[in-house]
Amino acid sequence: MQIDRQGMSVLAEDECFELLDTMQLGRIALTERALPSVLPVRYARFGDGSLLFRVGDGAILRAAQMGQIVCFEADSGDHTLERAWSVTAIGQLTVVADAGLLAQAEAIDLVPWSAWSNTFVRLAPQVVNGRRLGPVG
């Protein structure tokens, strides 16, 4: 097990994806009007390993239309925060436009937050990092 300089366990990429599969809520960090923005999103893993989001007309859709490089983050911890984990995935955000991919996306149980969240976008991670926090020793 690798430990970083802050004493946190560094997770292997497969561990990161296993943890992401246990959650449905994360955050996307993107650039909006030349400023950083962090927005909550529901997500699911797509068949090819990418992350799938269902969004409405807003900053995330605009970022996907521009093919922006974004950072996604999800985490979890117990109520005392004695044990927690965090996973980040960095990559290009794109709109799912291919008919075959859209059919696959529709088959995934990704409940939208609103009736206007009807566009699928996906993040193909190029860099995946994770850390696990816990008691030392």
Tell where the protein language model's regions lie, with residue ranges.
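Short beta-strand segments
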Residues: M23-G56
